[in-house]
C-alpha cells in the first residue's frame, strides 16, 4: 500500500507539470502543441499514480534503449511494443471508423516490405516457403457493391516454421507478393495455409511479455493491404476459424468479421487451374469491401 502524499508534495509535483506544459506554449504548430501537452499531462499522471522509483525509471530508460538497439531494417521493436500494448489497434480503431459494410482494418505488423514481386491472378506467393498450399479468392468492391478493378492487393505471411522472409539472414523473397484485381474486381492466388507463430520475443518486448506472464503467440493469419484510387487504404488480415489463439492474440488484432473458414481439401482433390499437389490443401474466400477515401 502506497504512503499518502502530502498536500505540499502534491503541489510541488503539480507545479512541475504546469511549468513543463507552459514550455510548449510557443509551439507554432497547434496540433504538435496539443499532442505534446497532452503527452506531458498523461505521462506525469502515470508517474504520480504509480509513484515511480528512480530505479524503475532507470529500468524503463534501459528498456527503451534496448528496443532502439535491436531495431534495424529487418526488425521494428517499437512497432512490436505498440502492438502488444494495444496502442496499434487503438490507433487503427480511431482512424478507421465503420463505414457501411467496409472490411475492417487491423494491425500492420513489422514485416511489410516495399517492392514485393508481382504475380498474375492465380499465381503463387509462396516463392519456395514451406507450408501447406492454400487457394485464396474473392472480390474487391466498394460499399455500394460495385467492382473495384485494378486494386493493388499486397499479401504477405509467415512460413510454416513461423518466420517471415525478412527474418532470415539471406536475401530471399518468399510468402509475399502483390497482384491486381480484375475488371470484375475478382482476384485469386495460391498462398500457404496460415499457422500460429510467436512474435519476435528474444528482445526487450519478449522479456516484458515473459515478466508479465503473457504469451508471444499470434493467431494464424494472412496479411492484406489493398489500395485503389479514391478508396481508403485497407490494412487487414484474415484469421483461421477454429484457431485456439483467436481469443488471446498477442497484439489484439483479431476481429470477428475477419475470421474465415479455411476449408481443408484431401490429397488428390481437384485444384483450381489443375495444379498438382501431393498432399492436402485448403481454400478460403475473402471478399474485400473498400471504404471511400
Curated annotation (Swiss-Prot):
Keywords, alphabetical: Aromatic hydrocarbons catabolism, Dioxygenase, Iron, Metal-binding, Oxidoreductase
CC cofactor note: Binds 1 Fe(3+) ion per subunit.
Regulation: Inhibited by 3,5-dichlorocatechol, chlorohydroquinone and 4,5-dibromocatechol.
Temperature-activity profile: Optimum temperature is 50-55 degrees Celsius.
Keyword Iron: yes
PROSITE patterns in the record: INTRADIOL_DIOXYGENAS
Catalytic reactions on record: benzene-1,2,4-triol + O2 = maleylacetate + 2 H(+)
Binding-site list for Fe cation: 164, 197, 221, 223
E.C. designation(s): 1.13.11.37
GO MF terms held by the record: 4-hydroxycatechol 1,2-dioxygenase activity; catechol 1,2-dioxygenase activity; ferric iron binding
Functional pH dependence: Optimum pH is 7.5.
GO biological process: beta-ketoadipate pathway; catechol-containing compound metabolic process
Cofactors required: Fe(3+)
Pfam families: Dioxygenase_C (PF00775), Dioxygenase_N (PF04444)
InterPro entries in the cross-refs: 1_2-HQD/HQD, Catechol_dOase_N, Intradiol_dOase_C, Intradiol_dOase_core, Intradiol_RC_Dioxygenase
Pathway annotation from the record: Aromatic compound metabolism; beta-ketoadipate pathway; 3-oxoadipate from 3,4-dihydroxybenzoate: step 2/4
Quaternary data: Homodimer.
PANTHER family per record: DIOXYGENASE, PUTATIVE (AFU_ORTHOLOGUE AFUA_2G02910)-RELATED, INTRADIOL RING-CLEAVAGE DIOXYGENASES DOMAIN-CONTAINING PROTEIN-RELATED
Function: Catalyzes the ortho-cleavage of the aromatic ring of hydroxyquinol.
Family that this chain belongs to: Belongs to the intradiol ring-cleavage dioxygenase family.
Protein's name according to its UniProt entry: Hydroxyquinol 1,2-dioxygenase
Species assigned in the record: Nocardioides simplex (Arthrobacter simplex)
Protein encoded by which gene: chqB
Amino acid at each position: 500500500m502506497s504512503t499518502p502524499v502530502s498536500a505540499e508534495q502534491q503541489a510541488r509535483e503539480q507545479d512541475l507539470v504546469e511549468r513543463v506544459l507552459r514550455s510548449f506554449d510557443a509551439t507554432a504548430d497547434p496540433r504538435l502543441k496539443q499532442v505534446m501537452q497532452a503527452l506531458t499531462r498523461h505521462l506525469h499522471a502515470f508517474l504520480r499514480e504509480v509513484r515511480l522509483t528512480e530505479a524503475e525509471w532507470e529500468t524503463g530508460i534501459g528498456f527503451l534503449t534496448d528496443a532502439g538497439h535491436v531495431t534495424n531494417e529487418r526488425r521494428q521493436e517499437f512497432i512490436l511494443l505498440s502492438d502488444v500494448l494495444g496502442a496499434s489497434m487503438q490507433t487503427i480503431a480511431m482512424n478507421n471508423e465503420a463505414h457501411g459494410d467496409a472490411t475492417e482494418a487491423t494491425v500492420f505488423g513489422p514485416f511489410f516490405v516495399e517492392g514485393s514481386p508481382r504475380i498474375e491472378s492465380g499465381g503463387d506467393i509462396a516463392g519456395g516457403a514451406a507450408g501447406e498450399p492454400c487457394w485464396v479468392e474473392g472480390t474487391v468492391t466498394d460499399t455500394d457493391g460495385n467492382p473495384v478493378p485494378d486494386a493493388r492487393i499486397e499479401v504477405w505471411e509467415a512460413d510454416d516454421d513461423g518466420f517471415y522472409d525478412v527474418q532470415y539472414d539471406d536475401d530471399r523473397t518468399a510468402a509475399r507478393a502483390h497482384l491486381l484485381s480484375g475488371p470484375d474486381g475478382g482476384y485469386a492466388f495460391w498462398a500457404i495455409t496460415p499457422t500460429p507463430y510467436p512474435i519476435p520475443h528474444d528482445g526487450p518486448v519478449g522479456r516484458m511479455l515473459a515478466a508479465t506472464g503473457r504469451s508471444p503467440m499470434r493467431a494464424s493469419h494472412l496479411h492484406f493491404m489493398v489500395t485503389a484510387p479514391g478508396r481508403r487504404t485497407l490494412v487487414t488480415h484474415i484469421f483461421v476459424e477454429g484457431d485456439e489463439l483467436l481469443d488471446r492474440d498477442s497484439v489484439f488484432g483479431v476481429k470477428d468479421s475477419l475470421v474465415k473458414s479455411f476449408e481443408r481439401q484431401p490429397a488428390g482433390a481437384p485444384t483450381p487451374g489443375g495444379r498438382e499437389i501431393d498432399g492436402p490443401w485448403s481454400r478460403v474466400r475473402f471478399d474485400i469491401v473498400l471504404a471511400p477515401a
